[in-house]
Amino acid sequence: MTDRQTIALVLGTRPEIIKLAPVLRELESRDHPYTLVHTGQHYSGNLNSVFFDQLNLKSPDYDLGVGSSSHGEQTGTMIREVEVALNEIDPAWVLVQGDTNSVLAGAIVTSKMDAKLGHIEAGLRSYDRTMPEEINRILTDHASDHLFAPTESAAANLATEGITDRVTVTGNTVVDAVDQHSDLAASESTVFDRFDLSPEKYLVLTAHRAENVDAKERFQSIVKGVSRAADSVGFPVIYPIHPRAEERLSEFDLSIPENIRLVEPLDYLDFLHLQQHAATMVTDSGGVQEESCILETPCVTVRASTERPETVTVGANELVGVDPAEIVAAVKAAVETDADWKNPFGDGTAAEQILDIVCGNHVVDNTHVNR
């Protein structure tokens, strides 16, 4: 049995690694005991282990290797394996970040044991129940002993669901991550040379969500719209393609126009540098919406809803769906946008604020305030 001050962190995907990196560094700086549990939800090397190495983070203490499968099978396997790991660790707190199946598994297991559950990036809502992540967010928020909301808007979402007494608005750890890594990315990234790019003279596409890439017509529409947009502004497109999307391109026999360049998934520093200097991002990723806003890079989101409405409110992001004409119009407008919006995601001290609460309340009682 380990020290009852131990904090366990359960994660499983690239965005979780990036957003929890500031928390891990803050734990190291405080010399506070912690254990890292990686479910293996992301199973490609470039989407997983390379991030720990490049960001100088310690390797996970537990690597569960769950991999990809249906939502139910994957989550069920995670619950079983995470329970074994957490029973061995016997932590005082378990921290999860975001809205993945790894987060839900960590939340369910922790809710059944003598440990506190903290949800980082709590309160996000798209109000679209067709998104698997929306269910994960809601269930995890309602199971948590403390909720670390990134914005006042997220806290207001929780209040409408009756959660008010255990919420702290900390800002988003993605701001901490961008602040900590931007200079390093500038000094180490070679993407401009590798791809023969000039700053602010290219577009970046990221499309990986099931509702977009698993539907041939939607995927084809996105590709067509982005290609036409690139022609209209005279810029090439870099598309770091997710394994899921690459499989669908082959399965659907979709051709990629010459002005869209497919590249392998990039490491975090390369992608951050590419994102920081893009003329516009076109994405279906929630994390890219946030990072683009922080980096002052205009964003066009090929979705009908977003759990990051702050990006739209401040003028950093436009939701357009997948209609090619709307994508073209939005990209043309975005390229001309003055990035003079205010970052709505905090001041870069989220990790410190989170651990001030968690490390200051490490003694566990036998009750959970909300269960």
Q: How would you name each of these model-derived features?
A:
Residues 1-235, 245-371:
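Nucleotide-activated sugar donor-binding and catalytic core shared by glycosyltransferases
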Residues 239:
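Conserved proline-anchored active-site loop of SAM-dependent methyltransferases
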